[in-house]
Amino acid sequence: MKDAILRAYHTYLKLEKSLSDNSVAAYEQDLQKLRNYCEAHGLDPVTMSFDDLQAFVYDTFCEAGTNTRTQARILSGVHSFYKFLLYNHYIDADPSELLQMPKMDRRIPVVLSVEEIDAMIHAIDLSLPEGQRNRAIIEMLYGSGLRVSELVGLKLSNMYLNDDYMLIEGKGSKQRLVPISPEAKEQFGLWMEDRCHLTIQPGQEDYAFLNRRGHQLTRAMIFTILRRLCQKAGIQKTISPHTLRHSFATHLLQNGADLRIIQQLLGHEDITTTEIYTHVSVQDLRAAVLKYHPANQKQ
């Protein structure tokens, strides 16, 4: 396969599909699996048939025991690549069109209780240089339901603190307005006082959250911050920044928020994505059985 096609595909993902750098890298990494298979079998991805692709799927998924989510991600990348080839007239027909996506098991997300989030907040050492920053990060993730990529990419020029909202650049460069909670606003204001004392590196001035060297935080840094706080707070769950987003949505729903409002706050295109938060907790199920089952009402 010619390098010119790969460069054109990269441009297509970046500009026409408006994908983030991380998403582009993921698509290209999965395409590399197809290229490796083709090299091993003397094939060219551009001229592959449906039967060739089926063999690739079997070889990659069945024999390696790849889980369903990984299968779906790789197939999505394959579909995207062949749509690009068809759209740009490199091929006359899409051989991936009949490849079926695996059925996805919908996982119930890990959610922290209000008490667990409070424990994480209390585990923050505010005497450390990064303490107030970390407190503001927790409040932003939990109080506004931001994705970790949205948090690290948050810019001061998109924050309207006097009006209590911020402009968020979501997936596919889609923008949405998100309210800033009073607590998040207060803690962010305190972080801004600390931020003034940093030596901010050129080109980093507009990023809301910086490390001690004045550079934009990375997603990996946020993961590390949260997991250390979780460990310090004695929380046994395996969490990520997305856990706070899940907790934000779940707690809103439990307290009566409309699902459509939650959908808008999270930036979900399809409400079926938001509907996963309608799951009932194990505690709620147990409470319902204890309250309503006749065997428990005899006592």
Where are the regions a protein language model picked out?
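Conserved catalytic core of the tyrosine transesterase superfamily
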Residues: M1-Q299
